[in-house]
């Protein structure tokens, strides 16, 4: 699974760079790459129904690769839209939010598993959250225009 995640991280960055090099805008290149990654995560919803361990591992591996490709593009969005002096702060705030989200997710997963007795709602949620996040990202910044911060 971790090797697939490594490939996904490199592949996600490669895909957006390739799309931009072929003439797409940075906005289109990043968002198309993120859409591809989001779509590759969606099958993880089916992992809980896999009868074969290797099939489940393959589905989860694909999702891990797609997550890393998504992350590569998400972190690059910061440098696409923010001035150089603000990138580290933005990424740091995002990292903090991710850490808090991870803590909350651990609590939610435990509660869901205890209440429902199954990982199904967690995997279904994971399978859809990337598409929702991409939609929110697009609604917040449809053109990925550079932010203008006061000096």
Language-model region placement:
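Transmembrane alpha-helical cores of Major Facilitator Superfamily
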Residues: 3, 61, 65, 92-100, ...
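Discrete transmembrane alpha-helix packing/kink hotspots characteristic
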Residues: 8, 12, 101-105, 136
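C-terminal transmembrane helical hairpin of 12-TM major facilitator-type secondary transporters
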Residues: 27-74
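Interfacial helix-cap and linker-helix signal at transmembrane-aqueous boundaries
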Residues: 15-16, 20, 108-117
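Loop-to-transmembrane helix entry/capping segments in MFS-fold secondary transporters
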Residues: 84-93
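Intracellular helix-loop hinge segments at the cytoplasmic ends of transmembrane helices
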Residues: 73-81
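Transmembrane alpha-helices of Major Facilitator/SLC transporters
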Residues: 1-20
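Multi-pass alpha-helical transporter architecture, strongest
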Residues: 42-50, 124-151
């Amino acid at each position: 699974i971790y090797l697939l995640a490594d490939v996904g991280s490199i592949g996600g960055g490669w895909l957006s760079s390739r799309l931009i090099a072929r003439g797409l805008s940075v906005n289109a290149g990043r968002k198309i790459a993120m859409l591809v990654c989001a779509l590759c995560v969606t099958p993880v919803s089916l992992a809980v129904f896999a009868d074969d361990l290797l099939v489940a591992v393959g589905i989860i591996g694909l999702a891990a690769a797609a997550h890393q490709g998504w992350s590569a593009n998400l972190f690059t969005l910061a440098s696409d839209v923010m001035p150089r002096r603000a990138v580290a702060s933005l990424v740091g705030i995002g990292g903090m939010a991710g850490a808090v989200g991870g803590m909350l997710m651990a609590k939610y997963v435990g509660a869901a598993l205890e209440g429902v007795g199954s990982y199904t709602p967690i995997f279904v949620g994971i399978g859809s959250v990337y598409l929702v996040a991409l939609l929110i990202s697009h609604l917040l910044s449809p053109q990925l225009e550079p932010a203008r911060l006061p000096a």
